[in-house]
Amino acid sequence: MAKPILLSIYLFLIVALFNGCLAQSGGRQQQQFGQCQLNRLDALEPTNRIEAEAGVIESWDPNNQQFQCAGVAVVRRTIEPNGLLLPQYSNAPQLVYIARGRGITGVLFPGCPETFEESQRQSQQGQSREFQQDRHQKIRHFREGDIIAFPAGVAHWSYNDGSNPVVAISLLDTNNNANQLDQNPRNFYLAGNPDDEFRPQGQQEYEQHRRQQQRQQRPGEHGQQQRGLGNNVFSGFDADFLADAFNVDTETARRLQSENDHRRSIVRVEGRQLQVIRPRWSREEQEREERKERERERESESERRQSRRGGRDDNGLEETICTLRLRENIGDPSRADIYTEEAGRISTVNSHTLPVLRWLQLSAERGALYSDALYVPHWNLNAHSVVYALRGRAEVQVVDNFGQTVFDDELREGQLLTIPQNFAVVKRARNEGFEWVSFKTNENAMVSPLAGRTSAIRALPEEVLATAFQIPREDARRLKFNRQESTLVRSRPSRSRSSRSERRAEV
């Protein structure tokens, strides 16, 4: 009788702790004065590259002033077929966009039940009866166009079960209140011997050499000879402690420390595909299940609102944490929120469409501009925007509060551009078109257009426009009503545009 009571108390404490952490993560820390005094923005390429056994990790320098202004860090991972990204957690919440490929991921919420389990007959095939049948927490499928949300401190892993590489762009919101360390992005690995993804390679080699020298200089320290030289969270513990904690022999405990593992953070699964317990779905079945998940989530959200109005608190662990939907596809053209037939489309994901983003305080936008189409001048009301170019090229201009052009250049595939909050921006696709994903530092990032049907100019009275710009009312009326589209428009050929491109090429 005592065990069920203790289990109930434990689950209640886990719920209270986790809900407190999630609630605390709502919001961002105050920026230091002057961090966003940017006179110039740049389209940035990755500055650090790590080649792992089954993939590549590329990161942008988090100390760059643009990332310091936005309070974020960005990493791009390429996972080869049959590649496994080892279990890890980070000090900041993160959004991941799947630019290419498909696979599976597991997210390890503390205290949640292991709802995926193999049958008893299957577990006994080829094994003695003393082994228990395997069970683990839920596994989620992902595909191209998905946004995946990972809360701070929650461990997760990913595996490429397809025939093409998976390319994933991850943004870590280091300025989020959930991060109580410092502004440096930190990944904590549960296995392997990974490199620090945000530290230059030469600096990492120096740090490893320095640690080895320190250990050699202190051979008499208690337990020092039993500690590994790996870089995962088990490496710094005494092997005896680990053996006691897991109730295994010391040799097995030492394997956890991955001292001589040189595969880094993306490893190859040898032989056949990774054997885990999961439903086998076709593409149609997966999309049908996604729709069901969204419907269940809307119903649960409605019930929670009714409960709060009725004065009842929802305290079920499985309802609040374990069944969180962490994924939303914004790459499918049929999912578009804004569509102009000759210009392009935009899809967004925010806390209304993916409620977990309410706690992460992040959202995203996926856009596609057709050849020579224009995303009208606009600004982000309440968020910084980190734009990653997925395909093609675009002319981009960004203007600050002094009316100065801080960026006037081309943004190409694989590059990043940070657009600070309230800075005005315009994008025009080149001949091959332009596709991008924008990570935004607010759960419900809002955009205000400067031209078009829903613009600030359209909302002003004609007389105000005429007086402000010193133009006749007829011209003010044309400013307001000549453009009927809302956001994306088909642009006309411009002689000044071609001459500007020629001047840029000469420079």
UniProtKB/Swiss-Prot annotation:
Alphabetical GO biological process terms: seed development
IgE-binding: region residues: 1-15, 57-71, 89-103, 105-119, 121-143, 145-159, 201-223, 233-247, 257-295, 313-327, 377-399, 417-439, 465-479, 481-503
Biased composition (Basic and acidic residues): 281-315
UniProt keywords, alphabetically: Allergen, Disulfide bond, IgE-binding protein, Seed storage protein, Signal, Storage protein
Disulfide bonds: C36-C69, C112-C322
Signal peptide (UniProt feature, chain positions): 1-23
GO molecular function: IgE binding; nutrient reservoir activity
Tissue: Expressed in seeds.
InterPro entries given in the database record: 11S_seedstore_CS, 11S_seedstore_pln, Cupin_1, RmlC-like_jellyroll, RmlC_Cupin_sf, Seed_Storage-Functional
Pfam families in UniProt: Cupin_1 (PF00190)
Region Disordered, residue ranges: 191-233, 281-316, 484-507
Motif (NGXEET): 315-320
Keyword Disulfide bond: yes
Post-translation changes: Proteolytically processed from a single precursor to produce an acidic and a basic chain that are linked by a disulfide bond.
Entry similarity comment: Belongs to the 11S seed storage protein (globulins) family.
Protein's job: Seed storage protein.
Protein's name according to its UniProt entry: 11S globulin seed storage protein Jug r 4
Organism, scientific name: Juglans regia (English walnut)
